Amino acid sequence: MEITQTEHGLRMSQHGVVISELRTTPGPTHSIADILAALIRVLKPPGRIGVLGFAGGGMQAPLCALGIETRVDAVDLDRMGWDLFRWHCPEWVRRVRWKKADAVTWLRAQPADFDLLIEDLSVPDGGDVFKPSITWDVLPPLIRDRLAPGGIAVFNLLPPPGGVWLRDVERIARTFGGARSVSFDDFTNRVLIAGKSIPPVRELGAMLRAALRRLRSRQAGRIHLRTA
């Protein structure tokens, strides 16, 4: 993992791919973390939130800027991101219950009480960064089974090494009975919001852009939503 200093904090990269923008003061990162934080504001999960893959806690600065005090349960096999977060953002540590563990093992041990589960895992491979294979097969049904009634899953997806992923995205959507997808002008990522209690795509898009404008994130005008 390569760590570089930025104007507002730190940047974590692997093979030249930015994994996380760790901002140390409340505000936008202008990255995928802004969308994930804005979704928490828009979806307003009333109870437990889980995050698979911590990546330095990049969501915390935009969450703070949006006035969200929600505590999250986070799990990751790599301790470096957590240690950087504790060192550079000590006042936000109380907002995160972090555990070093395999995501599947940890999730299997949890009760079905999550109102929101965010899958944000990544692995380096051949000079690039991809999603682990469990994102496409093991995790979707497991995440579905750990959601409370009306719970929602959010996947931060990347193209697989083969580059063909439409069928994989559609399969995840079917697992949850429906989904909305967010694509980006600036990133190859696709964020999938899956569940049975999601607003219609036009309504969700309007609310998400409003939250991003409030955050002053450049992503407010660079996202595109559709039904998956």
Where are these regions (language model features)?
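SAM/dcSAM-binding transferase cores
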Residues: 1-7, 11-31, 38-42, 185-228
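Short, histidine-centered active-site or binding-site loop motifs used for metal coordination
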Residues: 16-18, 121-125, 157
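The AdoMet/dcAdoMet-binding core of the Class I SAM-like
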Residues: 25-146, 150, 162-163, 169, ...
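A generic structural signal for alpha->beta connector loops
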Residues: 69-71, 93-95, 150, 176-178, ...
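A SAM-dependent methyltransferase catalytic signature shared across enzymes that methylate proteins
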Residues: 127, 168-182, 195-199
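Conserved beta-strand signature within the Rossmann-like core of class I S-adenosyl-L-methionine
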Residues: 150-157
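Short, glycine/charged-rich beta-strand-loop motifs at protein surfaces that mediate ligand recognition
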Residues: 158-159, 180
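Short Gly/Pro-enriched loop/turn and capping motifs at secondary-structure junctions
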Residues: 160-162, 198-199
